[in-house]
């Protein structure tokens, strides 16, 4: 099945292939990726789109001496295959297996850990500056997608590099046509000339000679520069990058290996910063992914023939529940608007966009802008809901404080993927949001125990006159009858189970379900307990917590946030302020970054399973 792929165990093996063999290898890699990712899950469409780009990159440059940085990093699978990790792909994104992102601990070819968007150009500037300070000569290349270019950080870095004129190559992987390509023979001719080493040298020599002609030299050069700049605005599609100080090359067909290799090889000889614009097709080689690239961006295991997932949960996801409720609220209140930072599908806002297109805003990968944009809307009478993953919400922290909470504006943050998300690992877990949000004045902060409660919290936020954050996990929840649902009230929790006063368990959010199972297991051992659903992280139900703590012998809190600054810590501070000298056992995430893997495996490692907590309580109770 594979003529060349199985012979590649290092970058040196790959470099032995000729161009015709590499074209065959490209198709073998696509077949391998589809087969492999269909079993493990992962980022499929983006990797299928960069096969030829990655092959040309590794032929034209010499990794690891030359430094290649992958923005976001989810498109680095081909890079991993070429650098000796093909035989680990059966463990991709699995517990203790191969990461789905570049990791410095994995390979010397992974120069910089990535996971979030728009960071690669800044990192490249850092590496290039270190290179120049050390008087080294290697190349630094940042590979960034057109989507990531919507992030302001990318342009901050472009601005800095253009001013410094460092030798850095930025490869823009454009798979959405967000920069319109120029066409025609003149464009191709100009690009060919501008990348030719001899042209660069002759151009520099001619400019030097003309500028040194007595009396008229500098005037001639100024006239020539003005003419060149005027023509450039008509014919050069990358004039924006030229104005930032980059030599712009492109667009180049991202699936023509020969063209890519040729232009990359010649780009190495250009002095100063270069932006190479490459046009690719996301999902290339797998028809279903080409037709629906968003659907196949990140996938669970699936059937190759149909593209359908192997396992499917019939319940609604928390994202869908939040989005569905928001649509209903917006039908009742025309001041409600929804905002996403390039993730309408992931955050459950697709239906809102269809139902209320004039009140839906996708701002691109720009969380900082989204947060202040929301505050501006709120300042003028609207009720914005900004749906965002917990890990990406970190990027908007100052805007939440400075632009929304200080002014006490009615902005709601729907914080999706809170807690451990599993296979994407450290860069994607939402393990810090309670720590960094609970300290902000004016912010009301909630965590629902299930889908019904999430829906009610969205409705509560729609009527609340102040900033609100609601955190909820990746996962699904049924929407059974609300017969046992007690209405929400600001700053009030609820008791969801009571069999006695031996142990008090405060189980935050969706851990309340496991808390109920813990209580029932303890009963079988004649240990009787009370289970509380806090609902509000801030303001927490201080009166109920203090009352319950004083009645019980053992106190446990359970959450999926870091132990430092988490909900359990807030409970400890509350008891200390009330001079209650009872120890609180905080079951939370440790003070370290949690690796990738199945969530159940990670909880087992971290001591957060039902059995482990029951065993802890039983031991503590027996020691009383």
UniProtKB/Swiss-Prot annotation:
Binds 1 Mg(2+) ion per subunit. Binds 1 thiamine pyrophosphate per subunit. PROSITE patterns: TRANSKETOLASE_1, TRANSKETOLASE_2. InterPro entries: Dxylulose-5-P_synthase (IPR005477), THDP-binding (IPR029061), Transketo_C/PFOR_II (IPR009014), Transketolase-like_Pyr-bd (IPR005475), Transketolase_BS (IPR020826), Transketolase_C (IPR033248), Transketolase_CS (IPR049557). It comes from the Bacteria. Keywords: Isoprene biosynthesis, Magnesium, Metal-binding, Thiamine biosynthesis, Thiamine pyrophosphate, Transferase. One of its GO terms (cellular component) is cytosol. One of its GO terms (biological process) is isopentenyl diphosphate biosynthetic process, methylerythritol 4-phosphate pathway. Its EC number is 2.2.1.7. It holds the Pfam family Transket_pyr. Transmembrane segments: none annotated. It catalyses: D-glyceraldehyde 3-phosphate + pyruvate + H(+) = 1-deoxy-D-xylulose 5-phosphate + CO2. Mg(2+) binds at residues 146, 175. Pathway: Metabolic intermediate biosynthesis; 1-deoxy-D-xylulose 5-phosphate biosynthesis; 1-deoxy-D-xylulose 5-phosphate from D-glyceraldehyde 3-phosphate and pyruvate: step 1/1. GO terms for molecular function: 1-deoxy-D-xylulose-5-phosphate synthase activity; magnesium ion binding; thiamine pyrophosphate binding. Homodimer. Catalyzes the acyloin condensation reaction between C atoms 2 and 3 of pyruvate and glyceraldehyde 3-phosphate to yield 1-deoxy-D-xylulose-5-phosphate (DXP). Belongs to the transketolase family. DXPS subfamily. This is 1-deoxy-D-xylulose-5-phosphate synthase.
């Amino acid at each position: 099945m594979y003529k060349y792929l199985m012979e590649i165990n290092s970058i040196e093996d790959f470099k032995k292939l000729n161009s015709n063999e590499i074209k065959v290898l490209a198709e073998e890699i696509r077949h391998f990726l589809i087969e492999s990712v269909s079993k493990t899950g992962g980022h499929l469409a983006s990797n299928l789109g960069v096969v030829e780009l990655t092959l040309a990159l590794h032929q034209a440059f010499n990794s690891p001496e030359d430094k290649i940085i992958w923005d976001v990093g989810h498109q680095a699978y081909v890079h991993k295959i070429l650098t000796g990790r093909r035989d680990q792909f059966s463990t991709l994104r699995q517990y203790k297996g191969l990461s789905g992102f570049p990791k410095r601990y994995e390979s010397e070819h992974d120069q910089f850990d990535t996971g979030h968007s728009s960071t690669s150009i800044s990192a490249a500037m850092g590496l290039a500056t270190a290179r120049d300070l050390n008087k080294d000569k290697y190349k630094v290349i940042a590979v960034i997608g057109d989507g990531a270019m919507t992030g302001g950080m990318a342009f901050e870095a472009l601005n800095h590099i253009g001013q410094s004129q460092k030798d850095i190559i930025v490869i823009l992987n454009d798979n959405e046509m967000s920069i319109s390509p120029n066409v025609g023979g003149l464009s191709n001719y100009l690009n060919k000339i501008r990348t030719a080493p001899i042209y660069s040298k002759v151009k520099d020599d001619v400019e030097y000679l003309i500028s040194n002609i007595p009396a008229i030299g500098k005037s001639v050069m100024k006239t020539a520069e003005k003419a060149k700049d005027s023509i450039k605005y008509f014919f050069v599609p990358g004039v924006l990058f030229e104005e930032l100080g980059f030599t712009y090359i492109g667009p180049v067909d991202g699936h023509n290996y020969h063209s890519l290799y040729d232009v990359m090889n010649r780009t190495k000889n250009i002095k100063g910063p270069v932006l190479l614009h490459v046009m690719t097709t996301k999902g290339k080689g797998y028809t279903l992914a080409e037709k629906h690239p968003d659907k196949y961006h990140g996938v669970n295991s699936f059937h190759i023939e149909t593209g359908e997932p192997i396992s499917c949960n019939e319940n609604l996801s928390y994202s869908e529940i939040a989005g569905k409720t928001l649509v209903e609220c917006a039908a009742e209140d025309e001041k409600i608007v929804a905002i996403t930072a390039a993730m309408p599908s992931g955050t459950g806002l697709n239906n809102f966009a269809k139902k209320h297109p004039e009140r839906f805003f996708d701002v691109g990968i720009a969380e900082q802008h989204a947060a202040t944009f929301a505050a501006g809307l709120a300042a003028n009478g609207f009720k914005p809901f900004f749906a965002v993953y917990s890990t990406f919400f970190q990027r908007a922290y100052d805007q939440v404080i400075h632009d929304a909470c200080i002014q006490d504006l009615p902005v709601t943050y729907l914080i999706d993927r809170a807690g451990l998300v599993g296979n994407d690992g450290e860069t994607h877990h939402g393990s810090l949001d309670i720590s960094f949000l609970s300290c902000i004045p004016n912010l009301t902060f909630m965590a629902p125990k299930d889908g019904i409660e999430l829906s009610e919290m969205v409705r509560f936020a729609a009527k609340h006159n102040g900033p609100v954050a609601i955190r909820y996990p990746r996962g699904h929840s049924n929407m059974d009858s609300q017969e046992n649902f007690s209405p929400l009230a600001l700053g009030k929790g609820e008791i969801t189970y009571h069999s006695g006063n031996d142990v008090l368990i405060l189980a935050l959010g969706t851990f309340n379900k496991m808390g109920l199972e813990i209580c029932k297991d303890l009963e079988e051992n004649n240990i009787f307990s009370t289970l509380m659903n806090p609902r509000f992280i801030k303001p927490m139900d201080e009166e109920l917590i203090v009352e319950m703590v004083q009645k019980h012998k053992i106190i446990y809190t359970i959450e999926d946030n870091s132990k430092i600054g988490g909900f359990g810590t807030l409970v400890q501070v509350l008891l200390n302020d009330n001079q209650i000298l009872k120890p609180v056992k905080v079951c939370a995430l440790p003070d370290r970054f949690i690796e990738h893997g199945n969530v159940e495996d990670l909880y087992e490692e971290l001591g957060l399973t039902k059995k482990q907590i029951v065993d802890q309580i039983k031991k503590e109770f027996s020691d009383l």
